[in-house]
């Protein structure tokens, strides 16, 4: 799926969008770059610790390499929510090194919301705690919101897409965030609670295959009652190497079957995360993570007609009830 100039032009002209010189150029630059991030990709995640920052800490010599014994692929599809907001929904699945799909590995991965001139974002300020921040004093920014697997909050940052480089890039120098799932799930880490991320995304053109890169220069951070303690610096790269769309047929089918539920889920979260106050989560004792229960809820409504108003409202109520169960009073 290549960038679509006609769609970009439509977004610029539609919805009564104001056009004003530099503002228009930044909007167009971002829209074109974000559309190039869609399609079928081989995804290569690689992370390594490079510098201990806390006295007495011994650097972990292991390299996180997602493709060591398999191939991770993602189908990334765009949903245009408004002329200034695009959602990139990712479906992650695995194949063996010979290229054969591992059945049942398809999973709804993170969503990425990109919004131009967003009025606010939610800063991660402590484990399970996010605080809204007003962005209106600084216009002309693209806000990137990376969600949990169930569209809940993870981390957000606002910056401009470059306008003077051969390939568009978007850089966020400091973005406090929860500990990544790759660390707790795959690396068995529980000795720190947060990651201070420095991210740079570079989107390459068609002559480079239409691939893109996310560079990360992060600080693993202990977050305790005494504040933040830097533990160790890590470097990482997420390469998205474009593949023919046919290699993501399974991920595409997985997404199509669930699109109606995902849209309703996103709309429900939009109603809650309106910037009016903090959002604080909790995990009820003895319960699995919220996303696991949301996956179960999703499976229970597959095949139901969510365009039917009664079914839609019932499903929305179930989503809200589940979110509230994991929300601190």
Segment roles from a protein language model:
Residues 43-45, 60, 70-72, 174-223, ...:
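Beta-strand-enriched cores of mature, soluble protein domains
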Residues 80-84, 138, 205-212:
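Short, solvent-exposed coil/turn segments at beta-strand boundaries
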Residues 55, 73, 81-116, 121-123:
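N-terminal intrinsically disordered, cationic/polar leader segments
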Residues 71-73, 88, 101-102, 106-110, ...:
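Short, surface-exposed coil-to-beta transition loops
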């Amino acid at each position: 799926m290549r960038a679509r100039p006609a769609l970009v032009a439509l977004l610029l002209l539609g919805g009564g969008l104001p056009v004003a010189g530099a503002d228009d150029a930044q909007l167009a630059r971002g829209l074109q770059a974000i559309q190039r991030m869609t399609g079928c990709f081989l995804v290569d995640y690689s992370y390594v610790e490079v510098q201990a920052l806390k006295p007495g800490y011994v650097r972990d010599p292991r390299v996180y390499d997602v493709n060591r014994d398999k191939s991770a692929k993602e189908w990334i599809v765009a949903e245009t929510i408004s002329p200034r907001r695009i959602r990139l929904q990712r479906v992650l699945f695995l194949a063996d090194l010979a290229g054969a799909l591992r059945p049942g590995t398809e999973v709804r991965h993170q969503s990425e919301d990109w919004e131009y001139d967003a009025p606010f974002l939610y800063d991660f300020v402590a484990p399970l705690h996010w605080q809204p921040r007003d962005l209106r004093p600084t216009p002309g920014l693209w806000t990137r919101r990376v969600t949990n697997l169930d569209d809940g909050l993870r981390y957000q940052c606002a910056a401009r897409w470059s306008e003077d480089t051969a390939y568009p890039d978007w850089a966020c120098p400091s973005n406090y965030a929860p500990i990544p799932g790759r660390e707790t799930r795959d690396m068995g880490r529980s000795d720190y609670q947060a990651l201070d991320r420095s991210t740079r995304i570079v989107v390459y053109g068609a002559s480079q295959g239409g691939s893109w890169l996310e560079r990360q220069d992060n600080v693993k951070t202990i977050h305790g009652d005494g504040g933040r303690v830097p533990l160790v610096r890590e470097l990482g790269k997420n390469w998205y190497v474009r593949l023919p769309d046919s290699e993501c047929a399974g991920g595409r089918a997985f997404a199509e079957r669930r699109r109606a539920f995902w849209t309703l889920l996103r709309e429900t979260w939009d109603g809650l995360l309106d910037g009016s106050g903090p959002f604080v989560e909790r995990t009820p004792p003895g319960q699995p993570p919220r996303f696991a229960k949301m996956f179960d809820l999703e499976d229970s409504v597959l095949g139901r007609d969510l365009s039917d108003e009664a079914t839609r409202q019932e499903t929305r109520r179930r989503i809200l009830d589940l979110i509230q169960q994991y929300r601190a009073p």
